[in-house]
Amino acid sequence: MAYNLPDRVIKEITAFAKENSIIKIVLFGSRARGDHTERSDVDLAVYGGDFDSFYWNIKENIHSLLSFDVVDMNSRVTEELKKEIERDGVVIYE
């Protein structure tokens, strides 16, 4: 289990990233820090590509009890969130 996520979920995220020309995905939040619980959501910062298609692929096609919070880093993002991602984030796709 890499990045505190099941390997199957990482493979699905990677496949959707490739399909949608995503440049980079950063895991952030409690799962990146390692202080998550089994009910913690999965926070993903997404750079480049077709964000909308990627977002819907994640929401509709990953068969897991995990919930996902997916942030488009190409849109307006608060400085506070950017700093959190830079501080705690782990690149899971590039």
Question: Residue locations for each model-derived region?
Answer:
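Catalytic core of pol beta-like nucleotidyltransferases
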Residues: 1-24, 32-38, 47-94
